């Protein structure tokens, strides 16, 4: 049988938890707005760079088609860049990424896979299954600046150019809007757009020269793509956390209402019992007076 003191303690605890959860929800909402703004502003630029790359590849002279970032080569090692969170309280965010990863590598030989883990949950899963983790990045998405994207891009490009990996895929959440995020698996190295189907025989003049344009352009495209993925991942994580905190807050409010109802019932029962005791005592005193 619950006591008044016990119920009051529970109500106080639920109130404190609700305040914490609501603060976390509010903080996630603030972060989402900032990340969403950056992500949505960058997307048109990223898409236009991809269009430029697509058009460029279809018109490159044959001697430039062997550029190491463009040329397809025999695949011995497949690199997989996995984006997860460092913190929990974000619903099924990490679970969906891990499940997508499992399906993607199903049937592939583990010794041919090289992993780059972003976040604690990717590292934990890959380590517990004895996968080859080339690099681990913990708390990496606390900074989603372009300079941070350049650091990650350099690590990935160095490994690709030095034949540590022969192709690179990324698994992450694309941020579409605050209520919709979707897991994406994309091949980002070598840098051949999927839209390219046939070459065009049109003449283009590159100034000052194609060789002086191609390297920095490919680097800028890759770094921008990585930056976009980082922003999408961070925004999606906060969207999942905000939704999880909202559900937790709503459940806490329901539990709080239920406890208040029980508290009022118990208080009424106790008051009724005390009134009955007083009435009984008065009746007993009247009998004694007679």
UniProtKB/Swiss-Prot annotation:
<comment type="subunit">
    <text>F-type ATPases have 2 components, CF(1) - the catalytic core - and CF(0) - the membrane proton channel. CF(1) has five subunits: alpha(3), beta(3), gamma(1), delta(1), epsilon(1). CF(0) has three main subunits: a, b and c.</text>
</comment>
<protein>
    <recommendedName>
        <fullName>ATP synthase gamma chain</fullName>
    </recommendedName>
</protein>
<dbReference type="GO" id="GO:0042777">
    <property type="term" value="P:proton motive force-driven plasma membrane ATP synthesis"/>
</dbReference>
<dbReference type="GO" id="GO:0046933">
    <property type="term" value="F:proton-transporting ATP synthase activity, rotational mechanism"/>
</dbReference>
<dbReference type="GO" id="GO:0015986">
    <property type="term" value="P:proton motive force-driven ATP synthesis"/>
</dbReference>
<dbReference type="InterPro" id="IPR035968">
    <property type="entry name" value="ATP_synth_F1_ATPase_gsu"/>
</dbReference>
<keyword id="KW-0066">ATP synthesis</keyword>
<comment type="function">
    <text>Produces ATP from ADP in the presence of a proton gradient across the membrane. The gamma chain is believed to be important in regulating ATPase activity and the flow of protons through the CF(0) complex.</text>
</comment>
<keyword id="KW-0997">Cell inner membrane</keyword>
<dbReference type="Pfam" id="PF00231">
    <property type="entry name" value="ATP-synt"/>
</dbReference>
<keyword id="KW-1003">Cell membrane</keyword>
<keyword id="KW-0139">CF(1)</keyword>
<dbReference type="GO" id="GO:0005524">
    <property type="term" value="F:ATP binding"/>
</dbReference>
<keyword id="KW-0813">Transport</keyword>
<keyword id="KW-0375">Hydrogen ion transport</keyword>
<dbReference type="GO" id="GO:0045259">
    <property type="term" value="C:proton-transporting ATP synthase complex"/>
</dbReference>
<keyword id="KW-0406">Ion transport</keyword>
<comment type="similarity">
    <text>Belongs to the ATPase gamma chain family.</text>
</comment>
<dbReference type="GO" id="GO:0005886">
    <property type="term" value="C:plasma membrane"/>
</dbReference>
<keyword id="KW-0472">Membrane</keyword>
<dbReference type="InterPro" id="IPR000131">
    <property type="entry name" value="ATP_synth_F1_gsu"/>
</dbReference>
């Amino acid at each position: 049988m619950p006591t008044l003191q016990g119920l009051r303690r529970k109500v106080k605890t639920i109130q404190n938890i609700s305040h914490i959860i609501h603060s976390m929800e509010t903080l996630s909402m603030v972060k989402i707005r900032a990340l969403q703004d950056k992500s949505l502003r960058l997307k048109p630029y990223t898409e236009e760079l991809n269009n430029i790359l697509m058009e460029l590849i279809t018109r490159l002279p044959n001697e430039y088609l062997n550029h190491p970032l463009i040329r397809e080569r025999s695949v011995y090692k497949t690199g997989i860049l996995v984006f997860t969170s460092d913190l929990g309280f974000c619903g099924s965010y990490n679970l969906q990424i891990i499940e997508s990863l499992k399906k993607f590598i199903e049937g592939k030989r583990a010794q041919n896979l090289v992993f780059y883990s972003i976040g604690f949950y990717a590292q934990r899963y890959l380590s517990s299954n004895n996968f080859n983790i080339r690099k681990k990045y913990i708390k990496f998405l606390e900074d989603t600046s372009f300079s941070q994207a350049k650091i990650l891009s350099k690590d990935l490009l160095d490994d690709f150019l030095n034949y540590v990996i022969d192709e690179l895929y990324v698994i992450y959440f694309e941020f579409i809007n605050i209520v919709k995020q979707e897991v994406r698996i994309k091949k980002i190295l070598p840098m051949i757009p999927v839209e390219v189907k046939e070459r065009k025989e049109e003449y283009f003049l590159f100034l000052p020269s194609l060789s002086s344009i191609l390297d920095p352009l490919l680097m800028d495209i890759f770094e921008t793509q990585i930056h976009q993925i980082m922003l999408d991942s961070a925004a999606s994580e906060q969207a999942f956390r905000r939704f999880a905190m909202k559900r937790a807050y709503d459940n806490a409010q329901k539990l709080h209402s239920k406890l208040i109802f029980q508290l009022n019932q118990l208080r009424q029962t106790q008051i009724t019992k005390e009134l009955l005791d007083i009435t009984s005592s008065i009746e007993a005193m009247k009998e004694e007076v007679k």
